[in-house]
């Protein structure tokens, strides 16, 4: 009887400890809406809590993605170049997880679906457990973890625990996607002006405190009205989208590109002084110029004019002051013939 009581007390203590851990995990995961930081937080939480050497997350790259792709911040897995690590949203596994929520091994998935066809990327990882992330009845990610450090199998209690972590992760990802929707321009997939301003203010404060450089670019599509007037607004929309793609491909991790309004864009370049900002601007300008846009049998060329400004704490008392300097430099680029970059003095 005494042994049973002791065992019961130990079990309750374990449950209380797990609940406290889950509370701390929930606080941690919901402390950020930055998608990349959130993914890192989820994976490191799994590594530590489950005592595993490998962890990865299949997630959507953006709101319109038709598949879940293995996020680049995976931990411990050795990837092969000849394998596409993705799971189509329409794959039966996603539907299965929607109606039968729980973590499974690869063998359990094979038995449940009949085969692993279409899951070659998942199978190549050889995960010990596959765990769906489900929020509001929708699968928004698939977590994979490798073998335990001790080498033994996961117990039923551990499976339940990792599902609880997955539930918290799913809610955090759902919140991050909602934030993404409210801060992203749906046409260009770039950030909106109001979000750009918010981040710029934070970066300016950090640059002033840490005495680090910071620059902004203002960019405008040359003769944009001609595309609308000559070919119609659908052509103008395509030009905006294609220009945005070049911007996204040209910026570095940590940079921020946004649609400022109409055919005008802005970029935030942390740890970058004015001359280096001009180099980045020129890379963007040349990239846009080299990009040929096909529209209804025609090949269209696009150019942009750019204004750059390096942050000066003695002059730039507000975000508007800094952006106004970049905007004036943009105006000079247009005055001097367009398709060029001008640095604000």
Tell where the protein language model's regions lie, with residue ranges.
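Catalytic core regions of nucleotide second-messenger enzymes
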Residues: 286-304, 334
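Conserved long alpha-helical elements within nucleotide-processing catalytic cores of c-di-GMP signaling
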Residues: 194-204, 208-215, 225-252, 258-262, ...
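Signal-transmission linkers at sensory-effector interfaces
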Residues: 1-31, 36-37, 188
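GAF sensory/regulatory domain recognition
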Residues: 44, 56-89
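Signal-transducing coupling segments at domain and membrane junctions
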Residues: 103-127
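Catalytic-core segments of nucleotide cyclases and related cyclic-nucleotide turnover enzymes
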Residues: 278, 311-344
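A short, aliphatic-rich beta-strand micro-motif
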Residues: 126-134
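Acidic/proline- and glycine-rich, intrinsically disordered low-complexity segments
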Residues: 78-104, 109-110
